[in-house]
């Protein structure tokens, strides 16, 4: 079978990592922010891509692609995965009517945790909803960037996330200040982190690194603080490396992190 991957700008590191066997399609106007002009142009671009490939199955992911895609693609060929329903239910509740309206514009809605499925149903989104947990390929640890500065610490605490309020980076920094003998490493920042004042000497924001999950092999503990989640892939990657996990009890996290057993 052939696989076609559609993305917005298509200029990030993840785009370059996609297998050569995958057909890559740009949809330049598919953007995170709301814009009537860009969204209408994205719908037109998605229609052209659909006609070009005539796919048997269309797998849509939240949020923007899930909305526009359900407007464009045939219902019977479309599956929609919700990666963390709290991003709508709590953080952007004004979009809830749109999700309700479009729920029948796909053949199935996939929640990534029982928590999300339960909340989808409680909010009236009940059409062919089921839970399928996220899966991963175990990260390849053969070609990792050296971080010799971490060897001086008793333990290394790793977090992998975008730097945004949802992910509570200030809490990560505050914990680092409390434990100066431990090294704290954050992978995922796109630019220098300056908005939280001077970082403690043991706190390192190292940027957006390809194959980030593989660096769990160089850590002693994985930490993910967050206001809301679906079922974080980074936690699953950390667990695949045998790391204990300290994470906020949000979304489906407690379905995989068992307190006092494999984390806290």
Feature roles, as predicted:
Residues 60-66, 82:
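Short His-centered aromatic/hydrophobic patch
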Residues 155, 159-178:
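A conserved mid-protein helix/loop that constitutes part of the nucleotide-sugar donor-binding site
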Residues 1-38, 119-121, 129-131, 190-192:
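N-terminal strand-loop element at the rim of the active site
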């Amino acid at each position: 079978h052939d696989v076609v991957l559609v993305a917005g700008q298509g200029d990030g590191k993840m785009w370059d990592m996609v297998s050569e066997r995958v057909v890559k399609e740009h949809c330049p106007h598919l953007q995170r922010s709301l814009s009537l002009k860009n969204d209408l142009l994205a719908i037109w671009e998605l229609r052209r891509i659909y006609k070009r490939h005539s796919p048997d199955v269309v797998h849509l992911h939240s949020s923007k692609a899930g909305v526009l895609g359900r407007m464009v693609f045939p219902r019977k060929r479309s599956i929609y995965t919700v990666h963390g329903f709290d991003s709508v239910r709590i953080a952007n509740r004004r979009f809830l009517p749109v999700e309700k309206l479009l729920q029948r514009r796909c053949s199935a809605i996939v929640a990534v945790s029982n928590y999300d499925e339960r909340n989808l149903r409680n909010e009236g989104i009940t059409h062919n909803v089921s839970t399928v947990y996220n899966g991963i390929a175990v990260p390849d640890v053969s070609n990792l960037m050296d971080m010799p500065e971490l060897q001086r610490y008793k333990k290394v605490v790793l977090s992998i996330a975008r730097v945004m309020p949802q992910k509570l980076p200030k809490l990560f920094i505050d914990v680092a200040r409390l434990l100066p003998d431990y090294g704290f490493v954050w992978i995922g920042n796109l630019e220098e982190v300056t908005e939280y004042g001077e970082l403690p000497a043991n706190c390192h924001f190292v940027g957006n690194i390809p194959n980030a999950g593989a660096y769990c092999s160089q850590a002693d503990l994985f930490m993910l603080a967050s206001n809301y989640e679906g079922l974080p892939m980074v936690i699953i990657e950390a667990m695949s490396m045998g790391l204990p996990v300290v994470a906020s009890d949000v979304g489906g996290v407690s379905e995989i992190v068992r307190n006092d057993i494999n984390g806290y």
